[in-house]
């Protein structure tokens, strides 16, 4: 291994047979592939190295070190190996070799929507518990995901195991919170402080996304589906009420704060009608305006909503 923990190895193309392209992440293509030596099916994430870059991009190195650190948790997709290869132009490419998981939450939700069925409540509960558990592990190790969405929550349909993937934008955060760049998260799952231009944020950005995913599992529709940053904010305000200094101290000082239409909060049950009382209570704690007041992943696991989940320790 060299200093970066990247193994110069058999070229990835000699070691693997690409079966199909399964996606395109922010930093490169993802293939389903077979390891020739063992026959094992894996996910190969090919990371592009930009023309002007000497060596491996820092985003990739960061992802590798974070994933190696987090690989112990069953709810984080496992990074099994890193291989270097050379592409047709003679440029270095990196292949991250991940365990292969057969579907994701976006496809899972879509299959129920298309069938006109609800996802069974105990399934929602089981998936949410695993998501909270995986995020508690990330946050406990000082890692924010910052791009949680159904598409990067992988799922094994047979075992109903959920695994958090695509920690590409994650960066280890240490207290005090550093200033962060803005280019994160799909709009629908983006926390209001990010939409309003906050430069210091914390685990609350992930917990907001977890809340949005919770609501979507129950209704099969995104709870806040905006097509611009402004529309996204207005959708949130229409349901939760327009925030003010009383409910969210400091909100009017945020960079992108303006005077917005004044909406009164509606009951969450209007947006998520078939969620029980304990579920609505947990959801309201995840969608709390003031980031520091948002429930933590660890606390969420102890919420009464999960009380009747059988055998939590096996999840």
Curated annotation (Swiss-Prot):
Annotated GO biological process: hormone-mediated signaling pathway; protein autophosphorylation; regulation of G2/M transition of mitotic cell cycle; regulation of meristem structural organization; regulation of mitotic cell cycle
Keywords of this entry: ATP-binding, Kinase, Nucleotide-binding, Phosphoprotein, Serine/threonine-protein kinase, Transferase
Family: Belongs to the protein kinase superfamily. CMGC Ser/Thr protein kinase family. CDC2/CDKX subfamily.
Molecular-function GO terms, alphabetical: ATP binding; cyclin-dependent protein serine/threonine kinase activity; protein serine kinase activity; protein serine/threonine kinase activity; RNA polymerase II CTD heptapeptide repeat kinase activity
GO cellular component annotations of the record: cytosol
This protein's encoding gene: CDKB2-2
Binding residue positions for ATP: 22-30, 45
Ranges where the Protein kinase domain occurs: 16-306
Gene3D superfamilies linked: Phosphorylase Kinase, domain 1, Transferase(Phosphotransferase) domain 1
Active site as annotated: 147
Assigned EC number: 2.7.11.22, 2.7.11.23
Claim: Transferase is one of the keywords in the record: yes
Keyword Phosphoprotein: yes
Name the record gives this protein: Cyclin-dependent kinase B2-2
Reaction catalysis annotation: L-seryl-[protein] + ATP = O-phospho-L-seryl-[protein] + ADP + H(+); L-threonyl-[protein] + ATP = O-phospho-L-threonyl-[protein] + ADP + H(+); [DNA-directed RNA polymerase] + ATP = phospho-[DNA-directed RNA polymerase] + ADP + H(+)
Residues with Phosphotyrosine modification: 27
Residues found modified as Phosphothreonine: 181
Entry comment describing in which tissues the protein is expressed: Expressed in flowers.
Origin: domain of life: Eukaryota
């Amino acid at each position: 291994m060299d200093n970066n923990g990247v193994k110069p190895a058999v070229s990835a193309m000699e070691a693997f047979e690409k079966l199909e392209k399964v996606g395109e992440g922010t930093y490169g293509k993802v293939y389903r592939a077979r390891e020739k030596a063992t026959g094992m099916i894996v996910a190969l994430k090919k990371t592009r190295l930009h023309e002007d870059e000497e060596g491996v991009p820092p985003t990739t190195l960061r992802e590798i070190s974070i994933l190696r650190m987090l690989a112990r948790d069953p709810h984080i997709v496992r990074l099994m190996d890193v291989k270097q290869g050379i592409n047709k132009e003679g440029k270095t490419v990196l292949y991250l070799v991940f365990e292969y998981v057969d579907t994701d939450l976006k496809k899972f939700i879509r299959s129920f929507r298309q069938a006109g069925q609800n996802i069974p409540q105990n399934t929602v509960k089981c998936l949410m518990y695993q998501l909270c558990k995986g995020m508690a592990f990330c946050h406990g190790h000082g890692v924010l995901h910052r791009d949680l969405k159904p598409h990067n929550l992988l799922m094994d349909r047979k075992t109903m195991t959920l695994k958090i993937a695509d920690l590409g934008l994650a960066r280890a955060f240490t207290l005090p919170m550093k200033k962060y760049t803005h280019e994160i998260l799909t709009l629908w799952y983006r926390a209001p402080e990010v939409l309003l231009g906050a430069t210091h944020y914390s685990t609350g950005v992930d917990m907001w996304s977890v809340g949005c995913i919770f609501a979507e599992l129950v209704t099969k529709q995104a709870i806040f589906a905006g097509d611009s940053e402004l529309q996204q904010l207005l959708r949130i305000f229409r349901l939760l009420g327009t925030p003010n200094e009383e409910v969210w101290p400091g909100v009017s000082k945020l960079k992108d704060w303006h005077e917005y239409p004044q909406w009164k909060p509606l009951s969450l049950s209007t947006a998520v009608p078939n969620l029980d009382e304990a579920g609505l209570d947990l959801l309201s704690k995840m969608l709390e305006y003031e980031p520091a007041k948002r429930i933590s992943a660890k606390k969420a696991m102890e919420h009464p909503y999960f009380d009747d989940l059988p055998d939590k320790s096996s999840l």
